Amino acid sequence: MVDRSTLLTSKQMASFAAAGFLRFDGAVPDELNQAAMRELEGKVPGAPAGTPLSQTYSPESAIGRIMRLPLVEGVITSLVGPEPLFDHHAIHVRQAEEAQAQALHADAIIDTRIPSFDIQLMYYPHDVPLEMGGTLLVPGSHLRRINESDIGRYQNLRGQIPLVCQAGTLLALHHGLWHCGRQNRTGRIRYMFKVRLNPTVRQVKLWNTDDLEDPEVARILGKGYPWYEAASGRLEIVNRSKFWRYLTGDDTFDTGYWLTRLENAPSTRHLVG
């Protein structure tokens, strides 16, 4: 049973719903980072897709110990429930002085599930300075469905975030978030470990909801991002309202009146006398 104190707050969940990711700097202690580096330089044993996460990594392994950290368990439980399934993992490497960057993309083929979602945990076992090519994220892109690298020709979106982080940093991404690995201009290899997890329960109020009525929650959910265009950006906010309704089970939530207006289809007949 996960300690309630390790679960995400409503404000953190609202940030996830709005941005499509959460960031936890230095979440993994240095001793584990060093052990994980030794594993990532070799091969991390996995499991068949659909295996319960609890059965995927040995408790003695560095990756297994990271997955069992209270903070990590709290994040996972809050987003995909207490017994998620292992989908796949990968050790992503950007070679030293690598001239090529990844194209902007969302992982896997277009995912039409709405509104349920997978998460991807991205773990960085060492410091990642700007020139090392940390993962680039486009906040607020996760609900605009695309097929893999269909957006690969786009570059330099306003508000994009090139990751710069300390060792032990963890990202939790909605599976639809646009991202890419950047050029590594240093003389050192850059490592990142990624694991995708599938939910086994409805993703409704899995976090600590004590602050659900905090006015800051609605403010976060109404936030725009620099790459949003004036008109189509409103569609992102509407989709976000739908997403929050799913997460909370509250079918009346709206950041303004946009979604409520779209749903106004009266069934009562008015009889003229």
Tell me what each language-model feature is.
Residues 145, 179-181:
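Short, solvent-exposed loop/turn segments at secondary-structure junctions
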Residues 165-179:
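Conserved metal-binding segment of the jelly-roll/cupin
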Residues 156-169, 220-223, 231-232:
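A conserved mid-domain beta-alpha-beta active-site/ligand-binding segment of alpha/beta enzyme cores
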Residues 100-164, 202-211:
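Catalytic core of non-heme Fe(II) oxygenases with the double-stranded beta-helix
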Residues 89-91, 121-123, 193-197:
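A structural signal for short, well-ordered beta-strand segments
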Residues 1-112:
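Non-heme Fe(II)-dependent double-stranded beta-helix
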